[in-house]
């Protein structure tokens, strides 16, 4: 019995000794490892796989486990394709690129302006019969709106279950695109408006960091695809592009099943405060009567005043000098006449914004944009042209300011002298015919910066503070 106890004690000491040197490169440690693994890999595999499965299967029945289910491996990612000349080889990976973001800054549900890597899968793709399609109904292409007057951007979207809008500050791109029981993408639509400067046909692409209006439509509209976003306070006079950006719930652009298709989004170009009204081929008098093609030609209709010396003086009248006198401002007739790039159309301009050439040839303006200037009224055969002067957005009170006390230190850009007598005011390289429009633009830029900072979580408070500051900014810069 004593001998048995002694043997057992010696065996125990041997086990302790072996355990103390398992990390040393020795025959003893190798033998112990082999004995523990029963051939090398079984225990490791069991431990690794079982532990991963046991630990991670507790969440949603295994949907969030850290190992890739072999059934989900896509062989399409394992080959580079057969590119034609000039095409590129695809990147390849044996495991769906699950570790593509290793060592990089992760997106992690945040809007990281310096760039990041997002490892979340793309998600469910709709069928070809369920592809998203959008049309912007208002503002219409080539439309002209009144300056500084509220309007609605109106859309019709097909095959999107709208109204699903997650927290953009903590769940940005953090979940896959999903579809509903009908096969339509679940998500929402963003609307963005950008200033195009002095032309509706610029030669350079617009800066995506610059926009005058942005809205994520987080409601379902009428449930039939009709959505809208309200542009409170309207826009100052200028040339603009409005576009949609259809998104899944977590704000990623919607993904479609085929490459060759129509676009899922839409854009329209329009003007605000342009020289259109009821002139040209239509309106009050059309192409007949009243000695000069046209009723209310030139700056006719309910069009804006003066434009700081840029009045049209009757547009490009080919009708023999009769009837198209509209808006002829005796006090400020030193402008260039804005002949719309030489495009003549029966004695009237084509409805574009002052100082802009070749805008939608053949289009007549629809609006009655009001701009600062000397109010004038001129009665003429075929109708009257009313030039009303407004100052827009004067407001009182509010928080912050244009420069001093600006919320978050986000200041409005300066209103400067452009050196162009026809458009003497400038803001960030864009020129304006009057100071009120320039001030409005500067304060809108500050407002957008304030909105962006609050939406990104860089500032505390609410976007209502940004709206309140807009009024103060306008007062101070005016």
Curated annotation (Swiss-Prot):
Domain of life of the native organism: Eukaryota
Q: List the disulfide bonds.
A: none
Q: Which residues are glycosylated?
A: 328, 332
> Which interval of the chain is the signal sequence?
1-19
Q: What segments bear the compositional bias annotation Low complexity?
A: 38-64, 327-348, 379-393
Keywords in alphabetical order, please: Glycoprotein, Secreted, Signal, Virulence
Q: Name one GO cellular component term.
A: extracellular region
Question: Which residue stretches belong to region Disordered?
Answer: 35-89, 299-400
PANTHER family recorded for this chain? G-PROTEIN COUPLED RECEPTORS FAMILY 1 PROFILE DOMAIN-CONTAINING PROTEIN, VWFA DOMAIN-CONTAINING PROTEIN
Q: What is this protein called?
A: Pathogenicity cluster 5 protein d
Q: Name the encoding gene, please.
A: CLU5d
